[in-house]
Design a protein with these regions (language model features):
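H-loop/switch region of ABC-family ATPase nucleotide-binding domains
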Residues: 80-81
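Helix N-cap at the start of a conserved alpha-helix in ABC-type nucleotide-binding domains
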Residues: 55-57
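Catalytic Walker B motif of ABC-type/P-loop ATPase nucleotide-binding domains
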Residues: 44-47
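Conserved ABC ATPase signature
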Residues: 19-23, 27
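Conserved ABC ATPase "signature" region
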Residues: 1-14
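Conserved catalytic motifs of ABC-family nucleotide-binding domains
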Residues: 40
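Helical segment within the ABC ATPase nucleotide-binding domain
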Residues: 59-71
Length: 132
């Protein structure tokens, strides 16, 4: 029963009886998140959770993380290389370059200069903010 509740929390209860290999990449990612939620964690560590997803699905998965963080008070720690998603969906950002922390603070306060330092001038963040 908890498994079905976890699938419902991530919006894919209707896929409960579908084989995982028949699900889209985004749906598979949500199954992974549901499996994690089923364990009642206090923290979720996610390594590149949107790396192979299309932009729409990536935003949907990021929204799932934000909602889970806020509704269930679960800390979410993401390793993500999509700067625009990190800035739009995360409260805090830690920017690392060559093993050294370049920035550690609110996503809303990171500057282009700091992003350039992290990415050697290749980062081009979006200015659009999400409604989280």
């Amino acid at each position: 029963m908890r498994a079905l509740e976890s699938l419902d929390k991530v919006g894919i209860l209707d896929k409960a009886y579908t084989r995982c290999d028949q699900l889209s990449g985004g749906q598979q990612q949500r199954v992974a998140l549901a499996r994690t939620l089923n364990q009642n964690p206090s923290i979720i560590l996610a390594d590149e959770p949107v790396a192979s997803l299309d932009p729409v699905t990536a935003r949907q998965v990021m929204s799932d993380f934000v909602r889970i963080n806020k509704e269930y008070k679960i800390t979410i720690l993401l390793n993500i290389h999509h700067v625009d998603l990190a800035l739009n969906y995360c409260d805090s950002v830690i920017g690392v370059r060559a093993g050294e922390i370049v920035f550690d603070g609110p996503a809303s306060s990171i500057t282009q200069e700091q992003l350039d330092e992290v990415y050697n001038g290749t980062a081009v963040p979006t200015t659009e903010k999400s409604d989280n």
